[in-house]
Structures are given as structure tokens and as C-alpha cells.
Amino acid sequence: MPSHGERKNKDIECNIWNGIHDLECIWKYVQCNWDRIYLYACSIGAYFSLHAYKNRNIEKYLFLSPILDMDYLIHNMFSWFDVSENELKEKQKIETPIETLSWKYYQYVKDNPIKHWDIPTDIMYGSKDILQSIEIVRHFSMKFNCQLYIAKESEHSFMSDSDRKIVTDWIEGSI
């Protein structure tokens, strides 16, 4: 993903357009090499996948700590970092400790909500996730008939020793 892992210090913004571009490159490779495709995505990767792969022949999605409602997250960032919508519109981009807020990206989010999703999807959500509320995740799961698993005491990152087993068991039970 842009600005993640080995690309963390590269000059590539983590936004929907770069995310979709990367996922399209991956898709070209995957579709040529496999007949049955399952997708595993975490956090922002899940959000990008919802947009990049919505019309792709994928058997099942596995989303770990997915960002399902980017508008919700952006509004939380407005609150966390004392930024207003008008200020973002005026400045176009505002740096925060988490990520750069962009007016163009915000407009994309507002103009492109996920309205249709009919691909079988399993979601693992940590009860201590602060990036998406349980209400957001439950609403998405109910609206689009997804299987929702909630890990008590897990955070967005699922990085504790006990989380490894939770995630491994969930993946094995979902495929």
C-alpha cells in the first residue's frame, strides 16, 4: 500500500487513487495466475479494495479491521486534530500526525459511498478499534449480509500475542 511497509518513506501519497492503481496492478497478476480468488485486506487496504474490486470475480473477502466508512474516519480526524471542513476546503491539504487530510480525497469519499456489495465477506473487528465504531461495522455487515466476528480486547492493529491466534483461527475458519 502507498506509504506503508517498505514504501513508508517513499513520496507516494496514501490515497484512493494510488491505492486503486496498486490494486489494479495486483489484479492483473492475480487473474492471470489463479482461477479461484480470495482477498484478505486490512484497514485502509479494505477500503481501497471496496472501490477497486467491487466488480471483480472474487469468491470471498476477508477484512481485518476494515475502514468501511471513510467519511466517519475523516470526521473523527477533524475532531481529533481540530480541523473544520471549511478549513480543509480553503487549504486543500492539512498534515496531521496520522495522515494528510485532503479536500480532493474528502470529496471523493462523499461522492462515492459504498451502496452495493454482494460478494461474500467475513469481517474481523477488534472491540477496542478507534478508527471505525462498532455501529459502523455492524451496519455494513447487516446491510451487505457479511459475517461479523468481534474480538474482545483487540485493537485496530491486532498486534498482541493473543491476537495472532485470534486472526489465524478466524482466517482458517473463513476459507
Predicted regions and their residues:
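Short glycine-enriched, charge-decorated loop/helix-capping segments at active-site entrances
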Residues: N9-N15, F78
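Short beta-strand immediately N-terminal to the catalytic nucleophile in serine-hydrolase-like folds
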Residues: R36-A41, L64
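Glycine-rich phosphate-binding loop signature in dinucleotide/nucleotide-binding domains
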Residues: V30-D35, W117
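Gly/Ala-rich beta-loop-alpha elbow adjacent to hydrolase catalytic centers
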Residues: Y40-S49
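Conserved alpha/beta-hydrolase
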Residues: M1-N9
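The alpha/beta-hydrolase serine catalytic core
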Residues: N57-H139, K143-I150, S154-F158, S162-S174
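Aromatic pocket-lining residues of Rossmann-like dinucleotide-binding sites
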Residues: A52-Y53
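Alpha/beta-hydrolase active-site loop
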Residues: E13-C32
